[in-house]
Swiss-Prot record:
It holds the Pfam family bZIP_Maf. GO terms for cellular component: cytoplasm; nucleoplasm; nucleus; PML body. Phosphorylated on serine residues. In undifferentiated erythrocytes, phosphorylated by MAPK8 which then leads to ubiquitination and protein degradation. A motif (PXY motif 2) lies at residues 79-83. This is Transcription factor NF-E2 45 kDa subunit. One of its GO terms (biological process) is labyrinthine layer blood vessel development. The PXY motifs are required for binding WW domains. PXY1 is required to promote transactivation of beta-globin and for hyperacetylation of histone H3, but not for binding to the HS2 promoter site. Homodimer; can bind DNA as a homodimer. Erythroid transcription activator nuclear factor erythroid-derived 2 (NF-E2), composed of a heterodimer of NFE2 and MAFK, possesses transactivation activity on beta-globin. Also forms high affinity heterodimer with MAFG; the interaction promotes erythropoiesis. Interacts (via the PXY motif 1) with ITCH (via the WW 1 domain); the interaction promotes 'Lys63'-linked ubiquitination of NFE2, translocates it to the cytoplasm and inhibits its transactivation activity. Transmembrane segments: none annotated.
Length: 373
């Protein structure tokens, strides 16, 4: 059994005798019968620790309890453990074990009049009831056969025996709105159920692969249909000859066998559709060959374009180098040229021009030298 949770705002009292415990239990049963007759929705809790249950037909292991105490002035601070009592309780025998340091002060005896005059617990005070901090423990089932539950009171077990469990359970929840430190929904979300994807994946694969596998059957359906029709019409030669023979051989084949009009019509229909099928296959083959040739030509043109772009870049670089060399040559030539006064010519005012015979002349800019024979 897990350790008893720590009790807050309670004092440790002396031990309760067994005789007084049985008398208090009978008194409490009388109080509950009175409240049920009056239809009062009062909290079914006691101010003392669990009562002694009557022995069950089978042997019960002696439970061990940690020392817990009750403060009589606190007014039903925590619900006591629940014990399911049998239908008839003629007497309460003494127990071979004790409940630890659980007691009721002697100076304040419990009587029927005192319990009736005692004020009922405040509902707002019940909201301060907290659960023990730590790992959350699973909640006990209110309909369980266990009599050692620490989360339910004796009154709840008596109500479940005497009246409808659903109505009493809803009233109990309204009277005691206890907030749990954890929620049940995260636990359900933490372990989702992945059952649909395994069943949907094979179906999706089968649906996608079904038409692909059925294509060979569709392709051979025409041939099998022609063969069945030829067998039904009792054609004396196979369908392969009807389709593949040249025109002359096909006419000779028809002349060898006496065929009716319906048989001739069927043979010509089979040959026509077979030739159309062969022509369609040849057309598709030619289209594929043309596509392959165009792809190869496109690759060749792409490589040629790249080669021409590289050549153009090299030509541009060579032209830029030649322009730089020409500018340097102009500068050197104009540095060596002098007029009659010994002054140098400016490249901004004069330019060098070459005649048809190869002679070079220095002329001012903006003037053209006339061609001489």
């Amino acid at each position: 059994m897990p350790p008893c949770p720590p009790q807050q705002n309670r004092n440790r009292l002396s031990q309760l005798p067994v005789g007084e415990l049985g008398e208090m239990e009978l008194t409490w049963q009388e109080i509950m019968s009175i409240t049920e007759l009056q239809g009062l929705n009062v909290p079914s809790e006691t101010s003392f620790e669990p009562q002694a249950p009557t022995p069950y037909p089978g042997p019960l292991p002696p439970p061990t309890y940690c020392p817990c105490s009750i403060h009589p002035d606190a007014g039903f601070s925590l619900p006591p453990p629940s014990y399911e009592l049998p239908a008839s309780t003629p007497h309460v025998p003494e127990l071979p074990y004790s409940y630890g340091n659980v007691a009721i002060p002697v100076s304040k005896p419990l009587t029927l009049s005192g319990l009736l005059n005692e004020p009922l617990p405040d509902h707002l005070a019940l909201l301060d009831i907290g659960l023990p901090v730590g790992q959350p423990k699973p909640q006990e089932d209110p309909e369980s056969d266990s009599g050692l539950s620490l989360n339910y009171s004796d009154a709840e077990s008596l109500e479940l025996e005497g009246m409808e469990a659903g109505r009493r359970r809803s009233e109990y929840v309204d009277m005691y709105p206890v907030e749990y430190p954890y929620s049940l929904m995260p636990n359900s979300l933490a372990h989702p159920n992945y059952t649909l994807p395994p069943t949907e994946t094979p179906l999706a694969l089968e649906s996608s692969s079904g038409p692909v596998r059925a294509k060979p059957a569709v392709r051979g359906e025409a041939g099998s249909r022609d063969e069945r029709r030829a067998l039904a019409m009792k054609i004396p030669f196979p369908t392969d000859k009807i389709v593949n023979l040249p025109v002359d051989d096909f006419n000779e084949l028809l002349a060898q066998y006496p065929l009716t009009e319906s048989q001739l019509a069927l043979v010509r229909d089979i040959r026509r559709r077979g030739k159309n099928k062969v022509a369609a296959q040849n057309c598709r083959k030619r289209k594929l060959e043309t596509i392959v040739q165009l792809e190869r030509e496109l690759e060749r043109l792409s490589s040629e374009r790249e080669r021409l772009l590289r050549a153009r870049g090299e030509a541009d670089r060579t032209l830029e180098v030649m322009r730089q060399q020409l500018a340097e040559l102009y500068h050197d030539i104009f540095q060596h040229l002098r007029d009659e006064s010994g002054n140098s010519y400016s490249p901004e005012e004069y330019v060098l021009q070459q005649a048809a015979d190869g002679a070079i002349f220095l002329v001012p800019r903006g003037t053209k030298m006339e061609a001489t024979d």
